[in-house]
């Protein structure tokens, strides 16, 4: 294995890193083609090789970091996986002029990985803030019965093709490396199945960079990290470790759909605790981990 500083060699579209955060995904397809690559290519078993446009296979994992919305910080402690492929677009001179992301073969482009929310339900819902006596009693009966754990799960708020990648950013740390429209599901039996920050029509739009951000106040600039690159199989596989993508310029909408039929009571309480909706300059995403990219031709040949 060869280790070297990041360069253009073997770096086609490797900027398809993480999501973070942000776990996300769409329904899997029962008709998806199964692939069984071998050796160093085994991690690319969900590369969309059935799509002839796929030039590069992507397997990326967010292993640490944090997601801050308004007043609430959620550390990333459970690994989030992003997988799929990239169609690399060349001009007549065979120069790379763009990329298009292609979702995973089984449809699960971004894993739905729950992260524990510090403080649990007590950190999101405070029934004492309800002034109406009967509504406050109803809140206490429903939300103060011991089911206190809350998780936050990041999901894609648009098709995988909405993911935008830029190899230029990973190489030179300028501009956006990875664009992701996401929504965050708050999980707890008492919050119901439809408690989300963001939606398909009003997503949290992350523009992640390995460079330095330029957020509005009160946030201050933060800087990502390109990471360390290794080559396997004569550069047919590129591995980037200790990579960090950051964004602290995005806005976050209010949470909606929390508490089922009691959403009219619970949504305002959750949003008060979160500080949502939260304007740009009050939120932060830091996604750190490892990305692997492989030449699709070699991946297919290894099966």
PLM feature spans:
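Secretory targeting and sorting signals
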Residues: 1-32
